[in-house]
């Protein structure tokens, strides 16, 4: 039995929970809203996370609850669990640990018509009708498309639908938009979760607005479950502007764009559905068409239907491959949070800790009031500057779950804090080095301030079984803290799930292998999210010292790993030693001094073993961890590269010959243009080929002339659309106001690609183009440098990346003055320079090749 969602009734007296039972039926259950909290009481039968006695106070109604809470707060009395919303209390009480059943998921995509004289319709101005909606129901494995024929095809009927479309979907031809919307609401009646691509800011609010306009005033409420609350808009800042997002109740709406971003481990150069589909589902490319969607709808209605269907089929394909919505459901239910909470940063972790406190530890948690924002950011991950250049046979070791491991090793948890050294990290260093300099300790419970020599404090901490972090925060090791206890449980569960995944793989059970892989992935996400949550002031267990202690301790742990590698390979405990190439967060890259993959891998494994053997003594000596906790930190051998270029922090390119102990032949890119930029795929693939050949040992004298030839080909292209420089643009609206104001100084501060976007929008007005989209904040654009200024100000023009072919006026007035030389430099020379100059290699030019051939040929 799984819950879909839970809401508090309008009068706050009931909690409504929608449930999908074991028979697949959706029902609604109502519970009395629980109103209670705990207060300190020496005779109380409950205890808090610090072991103090507390007692529970129950209230008959919300008014009594809030009045009592206010009274206790005004009297300075600590409260427990008064800030947990009733719906979360109900979910925890009734659904924790329950088996998770399948929910009904529906993917959909809408297509909207527009008037060429008015331009594109939007949520703010939803004047145009919905032309078609493609739907995929996961439960029934059915694809359905609802479509209204254009005025150019008034006699189009069901019989006119081509067979290839009928083979792919159930097509329902609607007489008008009213019928289409009515049928859409009927289709989603049994859907628990609806999902589209960028549906939060377009599809869902647009359907809501059109239903209210075309059907009746509150028809859009059908997006919610019956007997639920009415939807409402919330404002979200996006790309520097405020946008409206519709919040629905009962039925869950998950924007798959957000889901994908949230769960996908690696950043993508572009999150346009077309690019994601090309990357993830090459067999399901987004369909392309010539001209505008306006023309496609009227001139080729059949292809228009295919286009709509394909977008929804892509969403199905992504979920089939990634299982991200299924993961979101399982993750939320394991912590008894709402499904939409998975897209946030703290609620799932918070709910999981509260459940652990209740059901594993039998304790209650204190209220939390978010402190005022200081505007300060705590230190992030540690990076060791690279030895820039090309290195042969390098390898890396990686710390297992670095931040969760540190929190477990030092028992980092709010209730475990015993005090803070005023000198922070300086005090930590002095105590580690057993200095006789005085440091000052501020006792947590009493605020008492005590100064004593660092070496004396070391003995005191050791005697009391207290650990010290890299921040100088002191944690009691006597009783396991709530956060380390949760992390230990998750770590053990992940280990068990990975074991079961391996057993299923050995048994040839693909379904169970996939299930356990997803379960271990959820635990990985939970483990990695805890540190970030602890640094969020809205987190119930927030204390910035928890996050800072973790990162600064992590720095020392990483430094030790680098020094230990140097000790093994160079005989000196010094991370500046020759062997150390680079370090980042939890990984160290180092020279193996070998000349073949097997020897390099063997050496890397030996180094890893030596690191692991050194950690117990290091953790005990440096942080005063007890014997058990000193065993937690572990490193794993990660990669071996026969040739790689280390460029700068977070920028490197490696050809791998081994990965996780297995011999491979593949590339690893970090930060470099062919990994992070939105270069046209044709150019990106070509540059990647040049780099791969270089790192596999091919002579640059052979590759260089091919680079020059490739640039010549680009320069000679008649079609300049391939030469646009990809950019993301923000604050277009704000900067347009500045531009139109005539403020000379203000205009100078407008970024070049934003200026180019303003020019595009001006051209739409000048040429009377209502078919091409305007560039707005958040748009992806292609920028073209020009050989001369336009209006004495514009040196480039942008084109929206969403359109396949620019309008005729662009080719007539701008294509002839595109600066091809500048564009090729930006697309080829500049990215290549970033990637190869660190190895002492120059980007080849025709002039340079002719000169060298003349001298040495």
Model-derived features: where do they sit?
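Active-site palm subdomain of RNA-directed nucleic acid polymerases
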Residues: 285, 558-585
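Catalytic palm subdomain of template-directed nucleic-acid polymerases
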Residues: 588-607
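Common nucleic-acid-contacting/processivity interface regions adjacent to the catalytic cores
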Residues: 291-415, 420-421, 509-564, 582, ...
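Proline-aspartate-enriched helix->loop->beta-strand connector
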Residues: 184-207
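C-terminal, non-catalytic extensions of nucleic-acid polymerases
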Residues: 605-608, 612-857
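Active-site-proximal helix-loop-helix substrate-binding element of RNase H-like nuclease domains
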Residues: 142-148, 152-171, 175, 194, ...
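Non-transmembrane amphipathic alpha-helical segments
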Residues: 487-504, 523
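DnaQ-like (DEDDh/DEDDy) 3′-5′ exonuclease domain used for proofreading
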Residues: 1-190, 219, 309-310, 314-333, ...
């Amino acid at each position: 039995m799984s819950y879909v969602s839970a809401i508090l009734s309008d009068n706050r007296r009931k909690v409504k929970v929608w449930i999908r039972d074991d028979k697949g039926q959706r029902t609604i259950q109502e519970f009395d809203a629980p109103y209670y909290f705990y207060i300190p009481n020496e005779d109380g039968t409950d205890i808090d996370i610090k072991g103090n006695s507390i007692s529970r106070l129950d209230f008959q109604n919300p008014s009594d609850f809030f009045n009592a809470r206010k009274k206790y707060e005004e009297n300075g009395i600590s409260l427990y669990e008064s800030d947990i919303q009733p719906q979360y209390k109900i979910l925890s009480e009734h659904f924790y640990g329950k088996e998770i059943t399948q929910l009904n998921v529906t993917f959909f995509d809408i297509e909207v018509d527009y008037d060429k004289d008015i331009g594109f319709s939007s949520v703010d101005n939803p004047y145009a009708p919905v032309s078609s909606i493609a739907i995929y129901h996961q439960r029934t494995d059915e694809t359905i498309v609802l479509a209204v024929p254009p005025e150019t095809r008034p006699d189009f009927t069901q019989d006119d639908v081509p067979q290839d479309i009928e083979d792919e979907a159930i097509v329902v031809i609607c007489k008008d938009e009213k019928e289409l919307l009515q049928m859409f609401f009927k289709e989603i009646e049994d859907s628990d979760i609806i999902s589209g691509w960028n549906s939060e800011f377009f599809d869902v609010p647009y359907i809501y607005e059109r239903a209210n306009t075309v059907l009746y005033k509150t028809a859009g409420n059908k997006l919610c479950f019956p007997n639920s609350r009415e939807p409402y808009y919330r404002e979200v800042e996006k790309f520097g502007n405020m946008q409206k997002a519709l919040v629905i109740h009962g039925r869950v709406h998950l924007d798959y764009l957000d889901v994908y971003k949230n769960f996908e481990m690696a950043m993508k150069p572009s999150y346009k559905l077309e690019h994601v589909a090309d990357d993830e589902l090459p067999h399901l490319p987004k369909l392309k068409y010539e001209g505008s969607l306006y023309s496609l709808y009227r001139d080729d209605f059949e292809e228009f239907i295919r286009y709509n269907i394909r977008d929804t089929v892509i969403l199905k394909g992504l979920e089939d491959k990634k299982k991200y919505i299924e993961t979101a459901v399982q993750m939320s239910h394991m912590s008894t949070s709402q499904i939409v909470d998975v897209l946030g940063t703290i609620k799932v972790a918070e709910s999981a800790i509260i459940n652990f406190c209740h059901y594993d530890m039998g304790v209650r948690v204190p209220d939390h009031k978010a402190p005022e924002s200081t505007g300060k950011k705590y230190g992030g991950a540690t990076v060791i500057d690279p030895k820039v250049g090309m290195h042969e046979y390098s390898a890396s070791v990686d710390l297992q779950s670095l931040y969760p491991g540190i929190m477990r090793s030092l028992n980092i948890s709010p209730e475990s804090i015993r005090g803070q050294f005023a000198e922070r990290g300086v005090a930590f260093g002095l105590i580690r080095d057993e200095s006789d300099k005085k440091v000052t300790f501020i006792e947590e419970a009493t605020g008492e301030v005590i100064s004593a020599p660092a070496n004396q404090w070391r003995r005191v901490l050791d005697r009391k079984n207290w650990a010290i972090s890299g921040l100088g925060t002191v944690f009691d090791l006597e009783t396991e803290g709530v956060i380390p206890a949760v992390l230990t449980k998750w770590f053990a569960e992940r280990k068990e799930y990975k074991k079961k995944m391996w057993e299923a793989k050995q048994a040839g059970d693909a379904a169970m292998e996939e299930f356990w892989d997803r379960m271990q992935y959820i635990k990985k996400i939970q483990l990695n999210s805890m540190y970030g949550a602890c640094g969020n002031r809205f987190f119930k267990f927030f204390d910035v010292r928890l996050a800072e202690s973790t990162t600064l301790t992590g720095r020392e742990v990483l430094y030790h790993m680098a020094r230990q590698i140097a000790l093994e390979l160079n005989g000196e405990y010094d991370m500046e030693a020759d062997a150390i190439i680079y370090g980042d967060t939890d990984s160290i890259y180092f020279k193996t001094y070998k000349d073949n993959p097997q020897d390099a891998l063997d050496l890397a494994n030996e180094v890893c073993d030596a690191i692991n053997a050194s950690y117990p003594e290091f953790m005990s000596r440096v942080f005063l961890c007890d014997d058990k906790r000193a065993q937690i930190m572990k490193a794993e051998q990660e990669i071996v590269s026969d040739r790689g270029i280390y460029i700068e922090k977070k920028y490197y390119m490696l050809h791998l010959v081994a990965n996780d102990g297995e011999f491979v032949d593949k590339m690893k890119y970090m930060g470099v243009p062919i990994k992070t930029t939105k270069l046209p795929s044709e150019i990106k693939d070509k540059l990647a080929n040049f780099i791969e050949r270089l790192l596999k040992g091919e002579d640059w004298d052979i590759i260089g002339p091919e680079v020059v030839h490739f640039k010549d080909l680009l320069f000679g292209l008649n079609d300049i659309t391939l030469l646009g420089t990809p950019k993301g643009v923000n604050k277009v609206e704000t900067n347009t106001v500045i531009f139109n104001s005539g403020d000379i100084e203000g205009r100078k501060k407008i970024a070049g690609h934003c200026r180019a976007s303003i020019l595009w929008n001006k051209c739409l007005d000048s040429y009377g183009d209502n078919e091409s989209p305007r560039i707005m904040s958040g748009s992806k654009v292609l920028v073209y440098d020009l050989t001369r200024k336009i209006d004495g100000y514009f040196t480039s023009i942008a084109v929206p990346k969403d359109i396949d072919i620019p309008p005729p006026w662009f080719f007539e007035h701008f294509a002839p003055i595109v600066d091809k030389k500048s564009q090729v430099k930006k697309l080829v020379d500049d990215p290549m320079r970033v990637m190869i100059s660190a190895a002492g290699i120059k980007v080849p030019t025709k002039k340079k090749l002719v000169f060298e051939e003349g001298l040495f040929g």
